[in-house]
Amino acid sequence: MPHWLILDAGNSRLKFGLWDGHRVHATGAVSWSGDWPGELDMALAAMARPERVVVGSVHQTATVEALEAISRRRWGCPLTRITTTAAACGVQNGYRDYRQLGVDRWAAVVAAHLRAPEAWHLVIDVGTAATVDVVGPRGDYRGGAIFPGLRLLADALGSGTAGLPSLAGEAVPLPARSTPDAIRGGVVHGLAGALRHLASEMLPAEAVRPRRWLTGGDAGRLQPLLPQGAVWAPDLVLEGLAQLARESG
């Protein structure tokens, strides 16, 4: 049974988990702000030496080199970097230029497809950006859409207004009866509405009983506002990175 450390270097956080050949467990995350190498070292302190360390990164080379230095210092283990390809794990990349597709989105659609290869899949990932991707039966990745996430929407509003409230807490009912609640409710419900519309536009008529997957750091907050049947899959990207690494040898 493999014992791999999987790293997802996203825009806001570094997510990690252990892959045992079947599922991801012992997951965690550290923010890029502050002393992230020290925080990661502490988070991994009790971990047994992994057989392999795998990373998918939306960042440039410097971040990957820093992660490899940590891996070599702690375990003497090199890093396997996963990148987007034209095809992998039975999925054909439908982008005109496959290199433009972020590796996190690629990993998520690969993981979704491998869970049910004969089904249509809609993958909604709500992090710094919100993405919606569609993959059809037999691994036909159709493409997707990108939309600002909760914090980006709030920041855009805050750049032109004063007293931006915290987005923490549950989504407030609308119509709101205070300006902070109106902003919070508008951002949260607005993003949920955009995602519902994108999902309905992107699934073709022949997509009967599609599987809907919800992942990303802010996805849990939006789940009650999205169509029923969306399955919360917080480790979908990590799972996909592990599957891509397994195929790469």
UniProtKB/Swiss-Prot annotation:
Record: active site: 104 (proton acceptor)
Q: What is its EC number?
A: 2.7.1.33
Q: Which residues bind ATP?
A: 8-15, 128
Report if keyword Kinase is assigned. Answer: yes
- Per the UniProt entry, what are the Gene Ontology biological process annotations, in alphabetical order? coenzyme A biosynthetic process
Q: Which SUPFAM superfamilies match?
A: Actin-like ATPase domain (SSF53067)
Q: What class of enzyme is it?
A: transferase
Functional pathway? Cofactor biosynthesis; coenzyme A biosynthesis; CoA from (R)-pantothenate: step 1/5
CDD domains reported in the protein's UniProt record: ASKHA_NBD_PanK-III
Pfam families from the UniProt entry: Pan_kinase
Annotated substrate binding sites? 95, 102-105, 179
Instruction: Please list the GO terms describing molecular function.
Output: ATP binding; metal ion binding; pantothenate kinase activity
| Localization | Cytoplasm
The record's cofactor note says: A monovalent cation. Ammonium or potassium.
**Main subcellular localisation:** cytoplasm
One GO cellular component term noted in the UniProt record for this chain: cytoplasm
Keywords of the record, alphabetical order, are: ATP-binding, Coenzyme A biosynthesis, Cytoplasm, Kinase, Metal-binding, Nucleotide-binding, Potassium, Transferase
**What catalytic activity does the UniProt entry give for this protein?**
(R)-pantothenate + ATP = (R)-4'-phosphopantothenate + ADP + H(+)
Binding of K(+) occurs at: 125
Record-annotated disulphide pairs: none
Functionally, this protein is described as follows: Catalyzes the phosphorylation of pantothenate (Pan), the first step in CoA biosynthesis.
The subunit structure is:
Homodimer.
Q: Protein name, please?
A: Type III pantothenate kinase
> What is the native source organism of this protein?
Alkalilimnicola ehrlichii (strain ATCC BAA-1101 / DSM 17681 / MLHE-1)
Q: What is the lineage of its organism?
A: Bacteria, Pseudomonadati, Pseudomonadota, Gammaproteobacteria, Chromatiales
